[in-house]
């Protein structure tokens, strides 16, 4: 018995090898799990559930097949695909979760999240995040014609890539105080997240005892997953 976690696949039509690797992962690994949790940035970009991109339908069908095989799939939005909505969730069989969720798995209480909210030193990003998560702004954006949304998304990605070139690694990583506050607030000693693309297992000393923060890697040249069982919490990097 085990539960699997993944994040930061950044699927797109331009990276067919990653898509193939993900579909293989669903068939060979996820199919044997108690559940699959996707902690954001499954897609490189998401401009609305009405986008007719064929890749989206292919991924939805594969996730639906997983659900129909008896493996539930849960999704937390990332900074790239925060507009994934109820329509895609229904089509894919995924269950949408809030940005922070506490799980009780095999005797461990684990806080799961995408991870971008922990990067509080990057004030410019946090300000941008507050804007794009405003329900009114999202409603206005989704009401635009698809071609407008495509252009806006492309400009935003280019601007983000340019901005990140001038940011230090420390600013783009999690803030230790933000991590501790989140774990104390939820009364947990385990945290799993993605976003930073820095796979590692961190041992922490909180005010209420020892804790662990496990970070998923991005799917670039290899896959990354966390396997939680009654015996262990394992970070696993694997070839496509």
Curated annotation (Swiss-Prot):
Enzymatic reactions: UDP-2-N,3-O-bis[(3R)-3-hydroxytetradecanoyl]-alpha-D-glucosamine + H2O = 2-N,3-O-bis[(3R)-3-hydroxytetradecanoyl]-alpha-D-glucosaminyl 1-phosphate + UMP + 2 H(+)
Q: What is the lineage of its organism?
A: Bacteria, Pseudomonadati, Pseudomonadota, Gammaproteobacteria, Enterobacterales
Residues binding Mn(2+) 1:
8, 10, 41, 197
> Per the record's keyword annotation, is Transcription included, yes or no?
no
Keyword terms, alphabetized: Cell inner membrane, Cell membrane, Hydrolase, Lipid A biosynthesis, Lipid biosynthesis, Lipid metabolism, Manganese, Membrane, Metal-binding
A Pfam match = Metallophos
Q: Which InterPro entries match?
A: Calcineurin-like_PHP_ApaH, LpxH-like, Metallo-depent_PP-like, UDP-diacylglucosamine_Hdrlase
The annotated topology with respect to the bilayer is:
Peripheral membrane protein
Any GO MF annotation of the entry = UDP-2,3-diacylglucosamine hydrolase activity
What superkingdom does the record give? Bacteria
Pathway per its UniProt entry is: Glycolipid biosynthesis; lipid IV(A) biosynthesis; lipid IV(A) from (3R)-3-hydroxytetradecanoyl-[acyl-carrier-protein] and UDP-N-acetyl-alpha-D-glucosamine: step 4/6
Question: What's the encoding gene here?
Answer: lpxH
Q: What class of enzyme is it?
A: hydrolase
The family assignment reads: Belongs to the LpxH family.
Give its localization. Cell inner membrane
Main localisation: membrane
* EC number of this enzyme: 3.6.1.54
Q: What is this protein called?
A: UDP-2,3-diacylglucosamine hydrolase
UniProt-listed GO biological process terms: lipid A biosynthetic process
> Which residues are recorded as binding Mn(2+) 2?
41, 79, 114, 195
GO cellular component terms? cytoplasm; extrinsic component of plasma membrane
Any S-S bridges, and between which cysteines? none
